[in-house]
């Protein structure tokens, strides 16, 4: 009795009308099993503006005005709230392209104009990526906006899933698909961009060939985010929305959750979170753990299950990042992490390390020494990506180049030098792998992925300071182990919660978990992405 697989229409609550996917199918009647029956039964959950004037008709977007001279529009591919998508032909060379034609008269609010401008900027920024639909140009006349893009006629990922036996991919084929989605997410995140609507309908195959590359499309809900700021609005598609989106405190991690949901579906043909109503789906997302017991999960490899579980961690800080996920053994290409991009979370950890108290830096160094290098594949990949000359250490120039890739943060050279100095514990002017691990470590993930091992590691780190083994770190023990001079008591204040002049194991673990930078919970201003980061 299976019915339509895909989720309800993408939603943006509280920030205006958006309908980014002109021809994607949406949820009709409810069914747990994937099927393509009744694929046309759709239900929109998007909030729309009511009334207003044709604001877009009064705006000159500054785009080229010679579309009709350059292209000839052909058959219709799909349509949405604001316009239509067509196949078109380049009059100069005969090449076929896709053209998204948007009716200015239907843009009745300023935010809808800003949405179009932002989507064009995003396509311009990402258009050179191998797994993002190519951007050619944007045009306008008095009536329409024309966004000219690469034509991908291989169909949606959704259709490929539905065509598979039991709507399932083999693990090998699923890994190929997931790897391409993760590359898109990692590139977006480096640019300070969050896609915010990753789902099978928003990925197209370049051609109908079996090995065709996958291309991300539809950035209508995508947005740029300020460092240290979280999105408050609820956007996306119900089946793929992350818990933190529903809590109105979301960031780049939400894209990884969505890819985790897609991976689950690719491997078993079912959704991990399902209900007949949207509110029911949200309740499942917030409270339920994905099932890995029912068929076919017993026959799926432990590596695949481990990968999916680490993407579907409800606490975003403990979830793998997109770049980390590319280093996971299950998704690696031929056992190697090919072209792993620099991870924004690693760069962020290195920036934060400078702001940590001296005590926390010392505690993190002790914790890092308890971890075997073979457990640090993702950080080794990151270190190698930053170590351009492959000499086994990161120089000031290599650090500068790495930090420059994180587009939202425009750090001055003096700040880069400060970060390198904080990471360089032996003061030789370079950061080796051991020093790098201390600053780049994801402590929240250590606890989430293996709580028993976390208990052992944090205890081992604690014991390095607890010389007499009485279960507490005293100022004198800290002085003996660190060689610090002067008054030690001020150092203890951050960790000594009960103010008894010493640090217990629980206080020590709390110190390791804590972060000195906290994200502010504010709304993303509608025009922010147009004034900052490109």
From Swiss-Prot:
Residues 14-29 have a biased composition (Polar residues). The keyword Transcription regulation does not apply. It comes from the Eukaryota. Activated by calcium. Autophosphorylation may play an important role in the regulation of the kinase activity. Ca(2+) 3 binds at residues 466, 468, 470, 477. Ca(2+) 2 binds at residues 424, 426, 428, 435. A lipid is attached at residue 2 (N-myristoyl glycine). It is a lipid-anchor. Its EC number is 2.7.11.1. Residues 374-409, 411-446, 453-488, 491-518 form the EF-hand domain. ATP binds at residues 77-85, 100. The active site is at residue 197. Residues 337-367 are annotated as: Autoinhibitory domain. It is found in: Membrane. Ca(2+) 4 binds at residues 496, 498, 500, 502, 507. It catalyses: L-seryl-[protein] + ATP = O-phospho-L-seryl-[protein] + ADP + H(+); L-threonyl-[protein] + ATP = O-phospho-L-threonyl-[protein] + ADP + H(+). Residues 1-49 are annotated as: Disordered. May play a role in signal transduction pathways that involve calcium as a second messenger. This is Calcium-dependent protein kinase 18. It comes from Arabidopsis thaliana (Mouse-ear cress). The lineage of its organism: Eukaryota, Viridiplantae, Streptophyta, Embryophyta, Tracheophyta. The gene is CPK18.
């Amino acid at each position: 009795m299976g019915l339509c697989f895909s989720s309800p229409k993408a939603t943006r609550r509280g920030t205006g009308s958006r309908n980014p996917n002109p021809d994607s199918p949406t949820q009709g009647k409810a069914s747990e099993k994937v099927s393509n029956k009744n694929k046309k039964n759709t239900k929109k959950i998007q909030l729309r503006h009511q009334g207003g004037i044709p604001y877009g008709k009064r705006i000159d977007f500054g785009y080229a005005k010679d579309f009709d001279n350059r292209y000839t529009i052909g058959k219709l591919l799909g349509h949405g709230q604001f316009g239509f998508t067509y196949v078109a032909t380049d009059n100069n060379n005969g090449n076929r392209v896709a053209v998204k034609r948007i009716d200015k008269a239907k843009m009745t609010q300023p935010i809808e104009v800003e949405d179009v401008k932002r989507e064009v900027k995003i396509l311009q920024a990402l258009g050179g990526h191998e797994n993002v639909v190519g951007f050619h140009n944007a045009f306008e006349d008095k009536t329409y906006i024309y966004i000219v893009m690469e034509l991908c006629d291989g169909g949606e990922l959704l259709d490929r899933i539905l065509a598979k036996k039991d709507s399932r991919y083999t693990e090998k084929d699923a890994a190929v698909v997931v790897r391409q989605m993760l590359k898109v997410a990692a590139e977006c995140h480096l640019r300070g961009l969050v896609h915010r609507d990753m789902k099978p309908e928003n990925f197209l195959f370049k051609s109908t060939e079996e090995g065709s590359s996958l291309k991300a499309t539809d950035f209508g809900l995508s947005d740029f985010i300020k460092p240290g700021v979280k999105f408050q609005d609820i956007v996306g598609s119900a089946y793929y929305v992350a818990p933190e989106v529903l809590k109105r405190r979301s960031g780049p991690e939400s894209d990884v959750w969505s890819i985790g949901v897609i991976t689950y579906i690719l491997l078993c043909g079912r959704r991990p979170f399902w209900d007949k109503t949207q509110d029911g789906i949200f309740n499942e997302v917030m409270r339920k753990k994905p099932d890995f017991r029912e068929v076919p999960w017993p026959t799926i490899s432990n590596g695949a299950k481990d990968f999916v579980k680490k993407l579907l961690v409800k606490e975003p800080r403990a979830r793998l990042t997109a770049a980390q996920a590319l280093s996971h053994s299950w998704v690696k290409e031929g056992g190697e992490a090919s072209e792993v991009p620099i991870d924004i979370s690693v760069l962020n950890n290195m920036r934060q390390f400078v702001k940590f108290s001296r005590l926390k830096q010392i505690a993190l160094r002790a914790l890092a020494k308890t971890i075997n290098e073979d457990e640090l594949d993702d950080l080794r990949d990151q270190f190698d990506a930053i170590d351009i000359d492959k000499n086994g250490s990161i120089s000031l120039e290599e650090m500068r180049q790495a930090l420059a890739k994180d587009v939202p943060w425009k750090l001055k050279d003096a700040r880069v030098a400060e970060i390198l100095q904080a990471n360089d514990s032996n003061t030789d002017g370079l950061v080796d792998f051991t020093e790098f691990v201390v600053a780049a470590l994801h402590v929240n993930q250590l606890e989430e992925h293996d709580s028993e091992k976390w208990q052992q590691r944090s205890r081992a780190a604690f014991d390095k300071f607890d010389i007499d083994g009485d279960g507490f770190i005293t100022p004198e023990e800290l002085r003996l182990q660190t060689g610090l001079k002067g008054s030690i008591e001020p150092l203890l204040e951050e960790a000594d919660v009960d103010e008894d002049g010493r640090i217990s194991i629980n206080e020590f673990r709390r110190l390791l978990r804590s972060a000195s930078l906290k994200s502010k919970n504010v709304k993303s201003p509608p025009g922010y992405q147009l004034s900052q980061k490109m």
